Amino acid sequence: LESLGLFWDDKISRQSENLQEYKNILEILKSKNLTYNCNCSRKQIALSNQSNFNEPIYNNHCRNMQHPLSNKSAVRLIADHKSTKFIDRTQGPQHNNINNSVSDFIIKRSDQIYAYQLAVVIDDQLQSVTNIVRGADLLNSTIKQYYINNLLNFPDKAYMHIPIATINNQKLSKGSGDKVNVNNFSLILIEGLKFLKQKIEKNIEDASPREILKYAVKNWDIAPLQQIKNIELNPTQRLIADSAHT
């Protein structure tokens, strides 16, 4: 990141340092009767109906069971029939019934680790985050986080879900072992801007990463990204990705 001219604005925040905050918020949600303990296995959940996001939607089996908390219990947040409505800057208006879209979801895992959905909302609040930019494949996660954010009366955030990079319609990601060629940082930035359909002037292509970023901020245009969830890498961009494996 530093070689690309990307630096953080404040001190590094680690989730391991925020465990007490997570616990406090979880207790608040429990006190409002918004949670319950769940003993369902992954297999049971996988047999549930599929949501419109192509992932298992929980059937709320344990909602009224009143299971005592144990080391094997997950904690779920009750998803009522309220609508989540927000305007995404690239994907447009988002309107979902949280219960129909994702149903009751886990906020503390059965291994006693706080779930990402809860932790990231609290992290953003602690860091005074106002604008969230992420891949379009995480729109489903945003629905859950938006719901938690509202339950806790945290200030609304502005969202933008940008297209993800794909090769043959398969997501390019670190999770699948994909890497980036780090031999030419300026080229990486230029191709990244082209991927995001930004106009590139000839005189900026050989500039330093810092100069390229200044140019990108000044000339940023969101219009070409409207309603696009994924973009296939062009041959040059594929070469950058592929050459990292050689």
Segments predicted by a language model, with ranges:
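Short, hydrophobic/amphipathic alpha-helical patches that form generic packing surfaces
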Residues: 188-195
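Amphipathic alpha-helices and adjacent low-complexity segments
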Residues: 183, 187, 212-222, 227
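Hydrophobic alpha-helix feature that most strongly marks membrane-spanning transmembrane helices
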Residues: 150-153, 194, 221
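Active-site cores that bind ATP or allylic diphosphates and position pyrophosphate for catalysis
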Residues: 37, 42-185, 200, 233-246
